């Protein structure tokens, strides 16, 4: 059974962090260095000073505890029982649709916060309502870490699927971006009898291929890309060239990186803050927000660096032993209805014809603003997409058996 969970970081852990911050040694910086070289020294100094003078983790902790937090045990094949933390916000609408929200890196369950009232309460005004479940993935946040090798996409998907079943949701929808995209896509691949529809952002996909999608390939070759699509491809190429170094390191040598991220809070802060700043579309991050995101990683039950292993494990999956290859979720997944949100400043923005290689796309929105963190930057856009998909007349209406999103 699921039990209520209260986030309570020990006083000694907070004190230890303060002591580490107090003796931090900062690097120098070239004259006129900017964001193109990484997190600027001035930003790190400002955040350190704000931590010392103003930031109150207990206030952030109270904000997190205001959500409906729970924990439960999930048995994962070949990995034993894992203690999983999750937020579970039920709607008062009896026919609400069960929805799993899956975060990525450097995100957490906190990303769902702004979505909760938009998704659980709109039924009062005649809109579609959802019961929302947002876990801390294993190795992230307040869920248990994994000590064995080989915990990849199959196991993350299994964990999330079994969590939904344990909560009584035999059929459900999902929403995810970044690793949440990969994990929810894997859920659709492995559990099509349960995962009936999915909304995705921060997507990754390939152009249509002549052998697999000849008509789509021809359409892609003959159709001129829109201005939005051309800008998206340019953004994607720029990220591959100048912004993907973190990914290669975490995909190949996460253990080497872990010493810096575990020993130095400044290293973790700079490593994460660069992504928050670069991947968002001029989102006005407050210092309190940034430090709260950082602290969820620093105080993570599995340690600050455990989350980076998802990159290595997912890209080194052994298909001969049942592992899901990293690129498999970027290809066609059958039996699931998909909605896609494209944000112009995300680091992977693809043409519509490419997105159609992912599966049965029943809704695709091109947002005028926004970056990688869709649920944080523009929760209204994510909620509007879900409404459009599942409302009466929407192309995903009624696909979750017995739960159409309306009062019964």
Predicted regions span which residues?
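The serine-hydrolase catalytic nucleophile loop
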Residues: 105-117
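Glycine-rich "HGGG/HGxG" loop immediately N-terminal to the catalytic nucleophile
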Residues: 59, 110, 125-128, 137-151, ...
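Active-site loop/oxyanion-hole signature of alpha/beta-hydrolase fold enzymes
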Residues: 93, 133, 137-179, 205
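Short beta-strand element of the alpha/beta-hydrolase
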Residues: 96-104
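Non-catalytic accessory segments flanking enzyme active sites
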Residues: 14-90, 95, 298, 302-324
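Conserved hydrolase catalytic core segment
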Residues: 118-129, 167-230
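Alpha/beta-hydrolase
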Residues: 1-2, 6-15, 20-21, 25, ...
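C-terminal subdomain of alpha/beta-hydrolase-fold enzymes, centered on the catalytic histidine
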Residues: 250-408
């Amino acid at each position: 059974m699921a039990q209520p969970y209260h986030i309570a970081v020990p006083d000694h852990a907070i004190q230890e962090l303060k002591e580490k911050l107090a003796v931090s040694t900062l690097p120098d910086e070239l004259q006129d260095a900017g964001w193109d070289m990484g997190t600027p020294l001035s930003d790190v100094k400002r955040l350190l000073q704000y931590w010392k003078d103003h930031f109150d983790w207990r206030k952030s902790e109270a904000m997190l505890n205001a959500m409906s937090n729970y924990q439960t045990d999930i048995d994962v094949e070949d990995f034993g029982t894992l203690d999983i933390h999750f937020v579970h916000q039920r709607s008062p609408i009896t026919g609400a649709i069960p929805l799993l929200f899956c975060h990525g890196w450097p995100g957490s369950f906190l990303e769902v916060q702004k979505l909760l009232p938009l998704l659980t309460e709109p039924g009062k005004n005649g809109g579609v309502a959802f019961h929302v479940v947002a876990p801390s993935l294993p190795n992230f946040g307040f869920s248990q870490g994994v000590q064995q090798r080989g915990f990849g996409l199959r196991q993350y998907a299994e964990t999330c699927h079994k969590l939904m079943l344990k909560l009584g949701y035999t059929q459900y929808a999902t929403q995810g971006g970044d690793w949440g995209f990969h994990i929810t896509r894997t859920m659709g691949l492995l559990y099509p009898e349960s995962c009936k529809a999915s909304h995705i952002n921060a997507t990754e996909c390939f152009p249509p291929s002549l052998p697999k999608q000849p008509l789509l390939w021809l359409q892609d070759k003959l159709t001129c890309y829109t201005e939005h699509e051309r800008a998206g491809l340019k953004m994607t190429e720029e990220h591959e060239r100048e912004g993907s170094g973190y990914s290669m390191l975490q995909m190949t040598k996460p253990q080497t990186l872990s010493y810096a991220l575990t020993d130095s809070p400044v290293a973790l802060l700079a490593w994460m803050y660069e992504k928050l700043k670069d991947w968002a579309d001029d989102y006005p991050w407050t210092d309190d927000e940034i430090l709260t995101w950082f602290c969820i990683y620093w105080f993570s039950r599995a340690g600050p660096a455990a989350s980076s292993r998802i990159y290595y494990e997912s890209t080194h999956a052994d298909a001969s032993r049942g592992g899901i290859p990293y690129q498999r979720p970027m290809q066609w997944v059958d039996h699931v209805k998909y909605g896609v949100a494209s944000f112009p400043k995300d680091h992977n923005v693809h043409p519509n014809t490419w997105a159609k290689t992912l599966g049965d796309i029943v809704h695709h929105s091109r947002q005028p603003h926004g970056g990688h963190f869709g649920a944080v930057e523009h929760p209204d856009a994510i909620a509007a997409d879900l409404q459009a998909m599942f409302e009466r007349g929407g192309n995903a209406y009624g696909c979750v058996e017995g739960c159409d999103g309306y009062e019964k």
